[in-house]
Amino acid sequence: MKRSMYAGHVREEHIGRTIVLKGWVSRRRDLGGLIFIDLRDREGVMQLVINPEDVSGDVMATAERLRSEYVIEVEGSVEARQQANDKLATGAVELKVSGLTILNTAKTTPFEIKDGVEVSDDMRLRYRYLDLRRPEMLESFKLRAKTTHVIRNYLDNLGFIDVETPMLTKSTPEGARDYLVPSRISQGHFYALPQSPQITKQLLMNAGFDRYYQIVKCFRDEDLRGDRQPEFTQVDLETSFLSEQEIQDIVEGMIAKVMKDTKGIEVKLPFPRMAYDDAMNHYGSDKPDTRFDMLLQDLTDLVKEVDFKVFSEAQAVKAIVVKGHADDYSRKDIDKLTEFAKQFGAKGLAWLKVVDGAFTGPIAKFLTGVESKLTESLQLEHNDLVLFVADTLEVANNTLGTLRTRIAKELDMIDMSQFHFLWVVDWPMFEWSEEEERYMSAHHPFTLPTQESAHELEGDLAKVRAVAYDIVLNGYELGGGSLRINQKDMQERMFKALGFTKEEASDQFGFLLEAMEYGFPPHGGLAIGLDRLVMLLAGKDNIREVIAFPKNNKASDPMTQAPSLVSEKQLEELQLQIEHHD
């Protein structure tokens, strides 16, 4: 029989109609000779009533066989429920069953198929197809589908062309590790799965496509955390002849449309803009969460003369003030914060409390000479807790930035209903890598340097600034973009600054350099992490919740057991050998 509608769509206007529904048995209850079934499908739950006086013996016998997660087909008439269930969208009606067929049986599931059930992450991933049956999960994927639909329509209406770029591409240095794919035909050679379509989308601008977009899978072999996966999806854009501001305007309009159509929220445009240096100095992060205060305060000059070497000899002394919560933090609690701070390079954490206008704590005695200045500078009041880090400016910023976020979450200071977007601009072109002992691209080596700082490519790389911009939401980097280099001599200077020899640059990027000899237009773009955007829209804290079949923190899939060993025959075809090290 053909399904009449989804179970979750049945309403009072359908009373009196005979309909056919199909779905899963969510729950079965026997009560006073009647059998009640909660039938679940993609759109919700509908109560079925099977009365032995209204059905044949065969139907009743079939009903008695039903267990959770059996797949069934039912026919019956829609009737008003005697006692409505306000918790269900279908709660005013029920289906009086006249026909019932079991389409498939089910084993007892390893966990209940309902929201809020306590199950380990690996168990959920092992039985992901069951986990995805839960209404909460289904809603997240409807939201994801709606988001991509809005994005496609918005960009289509602005004249963007959806172009697919290669999944098998060339491995290039810089950035995260590539996932490599051995070639059977060109033995000893490897493709790489793309970390982004960066170069190919730039080449599309050289081809005259003018406005490109793609919702594309990307791959990075990097350490995982809650908002990272080895394969992820991004909304990728590239444009020709547009300024930094014009690109940002397009992206803001897209985000505003997504927010309105998926959440019913009107966001204020334009988004605020914050210089990279201001973000680091005031928030301790290049992706600041502006939903709460507790900004970093620079006290380096104020405490320079105090008789406390930790402060007086430090390159930077910075602090955050936890307003009105000193009594929430015992000495033991602060010790935990200190150990946390050490994970980010700090040697320790100095602190004081304000009690009835006086400083208390282990460093209070060293600050008597500057107590009034500190009180005025930090606007201190009774029951304030002040946390200090004295170290390099980088360590002080990073440590206090992470402490700021941790404490705000601990004290429930963040309004989780708010969506705070902003642009972080005026980025440094390079960042120093302690591991590599050299400067590396803060974004990628195709980013255009500012006209004012480009001369420093042959001088002090720390002074080179980029025409780059990141879009941030609630402390998460949603995406990043920039204007790109379109002239060969500038691109060669960039490669040289990064330590490439001419031969290395030609070997890795010769095709791009050659393309720049054929009228490459000025261009720029941006990529937004779709998984991360949907995660935040859905109010989740891990992108696994909005990816259908994600990997765990070991980059493996407990369901399929990927990655897995392959046969010797497959290895021989690729002329590969596996060396086992004890």
Swiss-Prot record:
GO MF annotations, alphabetized: aspartate-tRNA ligase activity; ATP binding; catalytic activity, acting on a protein; nucleic acid binding; transferase activity
Keyword ATP-binding: yes
Subcellular location: Cytoplasm
Gene3D superfamilies, per database record: Bira Bifunctional Protein, Domain 2 (3.30.930.10), GAD-like domain (3.30.1360.30), Nucleic acid-binding proteins (2.40.50.140)
EC class: ligase
InterPro entries noted in UniProt: Aa-tRNA-synt_II, aa-tRNA-synth_II, aa-tRNA-synth_II/BPL/LPL, Asp-tRNA-ligase_1, Asp-tRNA-ligase_1_N, Asp/Asn-tRNA-synth_IIb, AspRS_core, GAD-like_sf
Region described as Aspartate: 198-201
Sequence intervals crossing the membrane: none
Catalytic activity line of the entry: tRNA(Asp) + L-aspartate + ATP = L-aspartyl-tRNA(Asp) + AMP + diphosphate
Presence of the UniProt keyword Metal-binding in the record: no
EC number: 6.1.1.12
Reported function: Catalyzes the attachment of L-aspartate to tRNA(Asp) in a two-step reaction: L-aspartate is first activated by ATP to form Asp-AMP and then transferred to the acceptor end of tRNA(Asp).
Record text on subunit structure and interactions: Homodimer.
Protein name per Swiss-Prot or TrEMBL: Aspartate--tRNA ligase
Organism: Streptococcus equi subsp. zooepidemicus (strain MGCS10565)
Lineage summary: Bacteria, Bacillati, Bacillota, Bacilli, Lactobacillales
